[in-house]
Amino acid sequence: MARTTPISRYRNIGIVAHVDAGKTTTTERVLFYTGKSHKMGEVHDGAATTDWMVQEQERGITITSAAITAFWKGSEKQYPHEHRFNVIDTPGHVDFTIEVERSLRVLDGAVVVFCGTSGVEPQSETVWRQANKYGVPRLVYVNKMDRAGANFLRVIGQIKQRLGHTPVPIQLAIGSEDNFQGQIDLINMQAVYWNDSDKGMVPVRKEIPADMLELAEEWRNNMVEAAAEASEELMNKYLEGEELSIAEIKAALRQRTIAGEIVLAVCGSSFKNKGVPLVLDAVIDFLPAPTDIPAIKGSNPDNEEEEMERHASDDEPFAALAFKIATDPFVGTLTFVRVYSGVLNSGDGVINSVKGKKERVGRMVQMHANAREEIKEVRAGDIAALIGMKDVTTGETLCNADKPIILVRMDFPEPVISVAVEPKTKDDQEKMGIALGKLAQEDPSFRVKTDEETGQTIISGMGELHLDILVDRMRREFNVEANIGKPQVSYRERITKNCEIEGKFVRQSGGRGQFGHCWIRFAPADEGQEGLQFLNEVVGGVVPKEYIPAIQKGIEEQMKNGVVAGYPLIGLKATVFDGSYHDVDSNEMAFKVAASMATKQLAQKGGGELLEPIMAVEVVTPEDYMGDVMGDLNRRRGMIQGMEDTVSGKVIRAEVPLGEMFGYATDVRSMSQGRASYSMEFKKYDTAPSHIVESVTKKQG
């Protein structure tokens, strides 16, 4: 089938916000306006849609849709052709930063929603940081302009001051709170109002109110100046006092937004139906198509050193990234993918290049606001759900088997908290295994393992809330009742000294013996290296090349078991530089054991130390309770990093060891009569004090 929407008219966007900015309402309005203006069941890039089946409505199934496809021709039908939006859903809670990260990884642009009253809140900063990390161009939408205390320009000031970005308003608010009526469109210098009769579908353009003209001219000048900075040519034109045309202003603002130099800002009230169609227009005008951003990078599965890339084109080999796995009771596992290049037809074979496993694509579906559409093919720039994938985890690449590539992996943080789970009945035992397996496949920051000594099932995640929700999902979705143990901290270990250690494993008693012998130089790894940095400096073949990987494996396996108290060893540099071998008795196993024996000696010779996870904690509290909250954080070995005033109270930032934060949610509520709230995320590992080391080593026996 031929492509019906050219890739230049695609917009893969996310609507991103923290908990209370009004993201859900905004997303609903986006679907309402796009669904209204585009008759479902007309021609798509695929087949006609089938409405939800009756049993689905009766059974009340809702598939957690990771992405919804919608179409838009403009609030005043000003674009000659429809643009295709893929709106990717992102959660707002900070315990799910991993969810936000994986959405941002496959987005080309984002609309960041702020509340007109509370403005930039601590959690907005987390989301903003993540968008910076993935270089996502964004627009700012200041919502809830009808709320008491709403002030568009104050929020613009906060974005500049707290987020360190240059916001450029392309609108101003007309009125605020109960009197919020609409926007001033600074590009066209018109006032825009909305009718209740069509639920704010079509903007009504009028002249700018006389009392706002001066302010509008001032902000338009700021905007034009920001546009002129896009090129020397425009700057000269601007400085010489020539008018920039509307087309020039738009093109320049688009260029600077995509380059990440500025963020354009608009305002409105999603709930009162005032402004969302203009947000959609701004997405088309200023956010990138897949072809506007650099080609995606990857590596050759056979040689990880070799860099490769894929351009957003149907003519390149097929490559897609699985960014979310969801379980549906009727069709099984849905694997949501973002296609970066090439074409895939249902029934095609692909390879999961990370695992080296072949997969066959059964059916493919796309989600719309009110229908699920089965499609026969996906092309570069598309987002769809594949049915029938056997063994694909979030973050893995699916690609053409003849031209494999591993797309840049997402970094998933290591879990910082663990609890033991036990099924309540024998019946639950088997179901729990299946449920945990499915949940771990969906969420790479959630791990499941069996403790070899106690036989208990241990689950690990990013915070208490993260694990609570997963246990709750196990009960709701899989009918598994389980008891939860006390939370345990996931410590780490590292060495502090450089040392040279000999590892020798010799068994020569009758028949074929074992002989492995190596000298390894150990040191703390270079800055920023978390795992093992392994170097081979053996010369003259004293240890044959084929045994070097076995030495690396021996070190890695021992690192998992630690050298101080049985916790994983991180940040280790190991250089094998000497050794010897036996013509007959040497083999890979012997060298692996020798390297493992050498690594074990690090406890004595490498100055091994225990590290504890430190969390970045932000507490928002009314001023009356600030003293209590700070005193309590100090008692928990917290280091106060800073404080500031916000509309919602005092924000206290601190770094606190995770081990001291268990049960904090309840404590902070009772300290503040339920008025304080907090968020926390993993920051770093740091040396644990001696009393913690003692109690941990005692526990490990």
Swiss-Prot record:
Q: Which GO terms describe its cellular component?
A: cytoplasm
GO terms assigned for molecular function: GTP binding; GTPase activity; guanosine tetraphosphate binding; translation elongation factor activity
Q: Which domain of life is it from?
A: Bacteria
Q: Which UniProt keywords apply?
A: Cytoplasm, Elongation factor, GTP-binding, Nucleotide-binding, Protein biosynthesis
What subcellular locations does the record give?
Cytoplasm
Identify the main location. cytoplasm
Q: What positions does the entry give for GTP binding? A: 17-24, 89-93, 143-146
Q: Which InterPro entries match?
A: EFG_II, EFG_III, EFG_III/V, EFG_IV, EFG_V, EFG_V-like, EFTu-like_2, G_TR_CS
Q: Where is the tr-type G domain?
A: 8-291
User: SMART domains of this UniProt entry?
Assistant: EFG_C, EFG_IV
Q: Please tell me whether the keyword Acetylation is annotated for this protein.
A: no
What is one process in the GO biological process aspect for this record?
ribosome disassembly
Q: Name one Pfam family in it.
A: EFG_IV
What NCBIfam families is this protein classified in?
EF-G (TIGR00484), PRK12740.1-5 (NF009381), small_GTP (TIGR00231)
**Entry's family note:** Belongs to the TRAFAC class translation factor GTPase superfamily. Classic translation factor GTPase family. EF-G/EF-2 subfamily.
Q: Which HAMAP family match?
A: EF_G_EF_2_B
This molecule's function is given as: Catalyzes the GTP-dependent ribosomal translocation step during translation elongation. During this step, the ribosome changes from the pre-translocational (PRE) to the post-translocational (POST) state as the newly formed A-site-bound peptidyl-tRNA and P-site-bound deacylated tRNA move to the P and E sites, respectively. Catalyzes the coordinated movement of the two tRNA molecules, the mRNA and conformational changes in the ribosome.
Protein name, entry field:
Elongation factor G
User: What species does this protein belong to?
Assistant: Pseudomonas fluorescens (strain Pf0-1)
